[in-house]
């Protein structure tokens, strides 16, 4: 056992790696070294077996505990079992992994799924565009969406009226077929959807002429969607039970309406906070004064402090977007005050500025005073 590599080293994970990290590492190695991906490559086959052996131990809590305590010696007894290292492989979890990677070749996970039982219908996703103002106040939109409904002629069976689907003879109505095959890891028991009935367990000899054997009829429907105030760009409104119909008596899926918000020319949004720029005159910046500020709720008055510098940011508490979960809770509105420096002056204005310049002391003229109104 001295030449056997450390299992953590084989998978490239630290000794304190959690189950998710171990599984992720094994998936990557399994995909890289699987013999079907490397036909005739003996080295790849060896590495694949090595990774599979390591995963079989480290993915099992009890085996991992024994390995952490005794190393490879924990499995020296009883060598020659079905799996490498003297213990049996449990292909339940590996079947899920291989099924994800190689289309169900190894099965195992399928044994835990009843493909012929009730299944929830698929969700349907559509987009709806609204204005920025509508996102602030909430709105109602009507959207057209194509949905499937049970065929009224065959009542969802897919069979011609007066006939019924027959039980699939290949799978006995189970929707899955089971087979055992010899692999480089030993005998592997696999399950796959039945190729004859495609996992339904039923065979339709005479198809319904209205739905062509699908059991469903597609039609366009108009659905009213209530979009709450405060919704953000890309968020979805979920309408339960308005998606695709379920299978074998399962519930319908949901309709997911993704909201696309047109950009505002005046405001920017970050979460529930609103940002905008407000231009103020040079005299207002120097002397202070009341200005009007446009918010998502309309204009409000704000008192500019004397000596305000350009770029000063001001917070208007509670003037931002409403919370989509509680309209009474709101974000804030942050305004950045931009001082407008005039570039074209008439003679009277120039004379006034020249008089102001002459009235400044030496320190003020060279910018050494702390403030315009400091003493």
From Swiss-Prot:
Q: Which CDD domains match?
A: DnaJ, DnaJ_C, DnaJ_zf
UniProtKB keywords: Chaperone, Cytoplasm, DNA replication, Metal-binding, Repeat, Stress response, Zinc, Zinc-finger
Needed cofactors? Zn(2+)
Residue intervals of the J domain: 6-71
Q: Does the keyword Metal-binding apply?
A: yes
Q: Which GO terms describe its cellular component?
A: cytoplasm
UniProt cross-references to InterPro entries, sorted A to Z: DnaJ (IPR012724), DnaJ_C (IPR002939), DnaJ_domain (IPR001623), DnaJ_domain_CS (IPR018253), HSP40/DnaJ_pept-bd (IPR008971), HSP_DnaJ_Cys-rich_dom (IPR001305), HSP_DnaJ_Cys-rich_dom_sf (IPR036410), J_dom_sf (IPR036869)
Q: Which Pfam families match?
A: DnaJ (PF00226), DnaJ_C (PF01556), DnaJ_CXXCXGXG (PF00684)
Presence of the UniProt keyword Repeat in the record: yes
Q: Which residues bind Zn(2+) 1 per the record?
A: 151, 154, 208, 211
Where's it mainly located?
A: cytoplasm
* Cofactor note text: Binds 2 Zn(2+) ions per monomer.
* A Gene Ontology molecular function term of the record: unfolded protein binding
Q: Where are the zinc fingers (CR-type)?
A: 138-220
List locations, semicolon-separated.
Answer: Cytoplasm
Ranges annotated as spanning the membrane: none
Q: Tell me one GO biological process term.
A: chaperone cofactor-dependent protein refolding
Question: What are the ranges of the CXXCXGXG motif repeats?
Answer: 151-158, 168-175, 194-201, 208-215
- Domain note: The J domain is necessary and sufficient to stimulate DnaK ATPase activity. Zinc center 1 plays an important role in the autonomous, DnaK-independent chaperone activity of DnaJ. Zinc center 2 is essential for interaction with DnaK and for DnaJ activity.
The record's function comment reads: Participates actively in the response to hyperosmotic and heat shock by preventing the aggregation of stress-denatured proteins and by disaggregating proteins, also in an autonomous, DnaK-independent fashion. Unfolded proteins bind initially to DnaJ; upon interaction with the DnaJ-bound protein, DnaK hydrolyzes its bound ATP, resulting in the formation of a stable complex. GrpE releases ADP from DnaK; ATP binding to DnaK triggers the release of the substrate protein, thus completing the reaction cycle.
PANTHER family given for it? DNAJ HOMOLOG 1, MITOCHONDRIAL-RELATED
Q: Which family does it belong to?
A: Belongs to the DnaJ family.
Q: How does it assemble?
A: Homodimer.
- Can you name this protein? Chaperone protein DnaJ
Lineage of source species = Bacteria, Bacillati, Bacillota, Clostridia, Lachnospirales
């Amino acid at each position: 056992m001295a030449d056997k590599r450390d299992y953590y080293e084989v998978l490239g994970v630290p000794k304190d790696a959690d189950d998710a990290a171990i599984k992720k590492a094994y998936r990557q190695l399994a995909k890289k070294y699987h013999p079907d991906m490397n036909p005739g490559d003996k080295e790849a086959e060896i590495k694949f077996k090595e990774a599979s052996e390591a995963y079989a131990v480290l993915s099992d809590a009890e085996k991992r505990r024994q390995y952490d305590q005794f190393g490879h010696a924990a499995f020296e007894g009883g060598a020659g079992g079905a799996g490498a290292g003297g213990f049996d492989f449990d292909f339940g979890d590996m079947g899920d992994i291989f099924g994800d990677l190689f289309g169900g070749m190894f099965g195992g996970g399928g044994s835990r799924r009843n493909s012929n039982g009730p299944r929830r219908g698929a969700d349907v996703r559509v987009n709806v565009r609204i204005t920025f103002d509508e996102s602030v106040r909430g709105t109602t939109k009507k959207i057209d969406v194509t949905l499937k409904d049970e065929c009224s002629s065959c009542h969802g069976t897919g069979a011609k009226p007066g006939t019924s689907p027959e039980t699939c003879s290949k799978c006995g109505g189970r929707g899955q077929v089971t087979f055992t095959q010899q692999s480089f890891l030993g005998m592997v028991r696999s399950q796959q959807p039945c190729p004859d009935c495609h996992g339904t367990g039923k065979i339709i000899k005479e198809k319904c002429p209205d739905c062509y054997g699908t059991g469903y009829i597609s039609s366009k429907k108009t659905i009213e969607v209530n979009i709450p105030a405060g919704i953000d760009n890309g968020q979805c409104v979920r309408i339960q039970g308005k998606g695709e119909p379920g299978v074998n008596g399962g519930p319908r899926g949901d309709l997911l309406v993704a909201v696309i918000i047109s950009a505002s020319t005046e405001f920017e949004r970050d979460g529930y906070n609103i940002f905008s720029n407000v231009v103020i005159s040079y005299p207002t910046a120097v002397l202070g004064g009341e200005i009007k500020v446009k918010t998502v709720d309309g204009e409000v008055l704000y008192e500019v402090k004397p000596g305000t510098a350009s770029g000063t940011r001001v917070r208007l508490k509670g003037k931002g977007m409403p919370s989509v979960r509680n309209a009474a809770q709101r974000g804030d509105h942050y305004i950045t005050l931009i001082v407008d420096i005039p570039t074209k002056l008439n003679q009277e204005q120039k004379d006034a500025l020249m008089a102001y310049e002459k009235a400044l002391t030496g320190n003020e003229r060279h910018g050494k005073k702390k403030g315009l109104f400091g003493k």
